[in-house]
């Protein structure tokens, strides 16, 4: 299992503006963990991208205390990707699989991204931040753009806990 970690300096140099915007309020440095299981005769490439928000306070659009209680689990998508890649490598499957795990903490501070700020994503698109608590899609878009550019996967799947609004729409 091949592993590579892109740290904050490399993320900045390579235009990961959306991911860095989410991490801007935190003292914890962001990273992008890349995992790869590549057996010799694999023909197609599957990419898995998992949301790795280690704690989600909501940023400046801060969550209420009760809504914030379980937010250390906002990295379950990342955990699934890591577990899948480790399992594939241990079982020596014949699948070529890329795992991308953007890791950030979404916190409020004087350096945090503000609602209304405009950031440039890894794909070169500009994004206006409407709500700092919609951080998952920002870190996923930078990771997905990087994976497409670098690995050109046949199939890409993202795994994430994205919004509590689905409970309003669908019920518990």
Where do the language-model regions lie?
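A generic structural signal for tightly packed, nonpolar segments enriched in small/aliphatic residues
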Residues: 1-172
């Amino acid at each position: 299992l091949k592993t590579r970690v892109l740290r904050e300096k490399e993320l900045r140099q390579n235009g990961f503006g959306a991911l860095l915007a989410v991490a801007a309020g935190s003292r914890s440095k962001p990273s992008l963990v890349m995992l790869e299981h590549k057996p010799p005769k694999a023909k197609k490439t599957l990419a898995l991208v998992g949301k790795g928000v280690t704690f989600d306070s909501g940023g400046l659009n801060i969550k209420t205390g009760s809504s914030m209680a379980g937010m250390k689990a906002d990295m379950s998508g990342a955990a699934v990707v890591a577990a899948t890649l480790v399992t594939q490598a241990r079982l020596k499957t014949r699948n070529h699989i890329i795992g991308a795990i953007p890791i950030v903490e979404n916190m409020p501070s004087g350096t945090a991204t503000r609602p209304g700020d405009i950031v440039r994503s890894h794909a070169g698109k500009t994004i206006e931040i409407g709500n700092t608590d919609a951080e998952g899609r920002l870190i996923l878009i930078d990771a997905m753009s990087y994976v497409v550019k670098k690995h050109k996967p046949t199939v890409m799947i993202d795994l994430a806990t994205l919004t509590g609004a689905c409970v309003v729409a669908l019920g518990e």
